[in-house]
Amino acid sequence: MRHRNRMNRLLCGALIAACALATGSGAAPAAADWRATVRQFAKEHFLNPAWGYSHCERDYALARSLAAADHVALDDDVLFAAAYLHDIAAFPPWGGDEPPDHSDVGADAVGKVLDGTGFPLGKLAAVRAAIRTHMYYRDPLAPEAVYLHDADALDWLGAIGVARISALVDPNGGDPDGPKAVRMLQDNLREVPARVVSPAGRALVGPRQAELQRYLKELGEESAEFRNL
């Protein structure tokens, strides 16, 4: 009996030591660690007012909300990584200078950012697929891709869509100026609504579409049909 108790104590000690080693500096990053790393990366590098860090946060939150409303289960690792990194190719050195399509360039580049963070690389292909189809004119397939796509599309409509485009206007008369910003909003109003595919996303299209329509109507009335912008 004493021998058995001694063996049990030794085994417990070995388990405690193993746990201590696992939490040491040589351990692989935990799930929370890779998410914190990715979030901090986006916060430091994605500074554009229209498609920077705050846009990533909105896309992630809205995609989760839409999926929950539709009772669709998502792989949150895939959604989180794709939402926070989907516009990476809009920023140098990962893209920046008018790449062929930032969705494709970003999908190819994202592995370099995730590698070494502790992200489960077996899910990298799904992240790439979601990034590749996040724009409203693309056709998403997997649930994570669908809800990121719809969240990103809806972020071009409503008051937030106005805020994003307005933030791009050059105050010194450069590109884009006020009239061009209006054309961008009109393009979004014309092209984006029909591309939202999920039931919960479709339910938000009408209110956001109407809000953007009202804004453009009132802005036109107050600016001689946009000539005095």
Q: Which residues are covered by each model-predicted region?
A:
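Divalent metal-dependent phosphate-bond-processing catalytic cores, especially two-metal-ion Mg2+/Mn2+ enzymes
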Residues: 33, 45-57, 61-73, 85, ...
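Bacterial N-terminal signal peptides that target proteins for export
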Residues: 2-14
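Boundary at the C-terminal end of the N-terminal hydrophobic targeting segment
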Residues: 24-32
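Short, well-structured alpha-helical segments
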Residues: 53, 57-60, 76-80, 121-132, ...
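Active-site-proximal helix-loop elements at catalytic-domain edges
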Residues: 112-124
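His-Asp-centered metal-binding catalytic motifs of divalent-metal-dependent phosphohydrolases/nucleases
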Residues: 76-98, 102, 106, 126-137
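An active-site-proximal "capping" alpha-helix that borders the catalytic cofactor pocket
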Residues: 59, 101-115
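Bacterial N-terminal signal peptides
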Residues: 12-22
